[in-house]
């Protein structure tokens, strides 16, 4: 593992910090080839001498069920002082921690006294929000192999023969690889389009980093589809006609337990994912399950085609 790959940080901005009650978590982040989740909560217990404290936790590979892995890491938790020009102006704690199947989380119940955390003079809270940060250095891992993710920023002899330009950045790819996976690129490279003979081809209205994710799923790298990239992978695989990536993203959503059913139904609706819609409808086992969906904030964003499917599901349940 390179020194660059084994270090990283998670910066977690918490809105309405003074109203923090139940635990809140940042989305998963990959550092050192393992998945990390930073969370914050308030705690009043014997561990805090019955005084309210800001608590903080860090989860490592929470979803991994294997017992064949371990991770030794150096961790630095920080509550940042806002409106400060000093890089090290923060309240911090440092730990050395070994994570494995039986120890996936480190919890600090008494990270910072609550009154001190929200005190205006201490400058931890600005405009009702605060910022937590964890810096992670993965010192040693076992049972987890390095994932090779390409950046496509350099040409490779015999493997790349065209340059795509996105947001002013060069992306070096092979025509045959893209044409094999994508009808869009097959037509671009091998039909009577002007781009056929161009050494550089500009791709508009696409975020560079998101397109790199798409390429890493098309190419035989080790990019995993997750809750952070599934949305733009669906969008781009639909735009560029890459059915294999669309199918992989659909399979991820079918198996994913974190994405809400309403959001899954919306994805299914937009990208015509019949397997995903069927899986969602199959999870609705009672009429109450169906009617409860209307309370979700994104329920009204659904189109009539999904409403019709939900109505038919409700009718079927009531008739049983």
UniProtKB/Swiss-Prot annotation:
Coiled coil: none
PROSITE patterns linked: BTB (PS50097), MATH (PS50144)
Limits of the MATH domain: 7-136
BTB domain ranges (all copies): 160-227
Pfam families assigned to the protein according to its UniProt record, in alphabetical order: BTB, MATH
InterPro entries in UniProt: BTB/POZ_dom, MATH/TRAF_dom, SKP1/BTB/POZ_sf, TRAF-like
CDD domains: BTB_POZ_ZBTB_KLHL-like (cd18186)
Entry-linked PANTHER family: BTB AND MATH DOMAIN-CONTAINING PROTEIN 36-RELATED
Protein name in the entry: BTB and MATH domain-containing protein 36
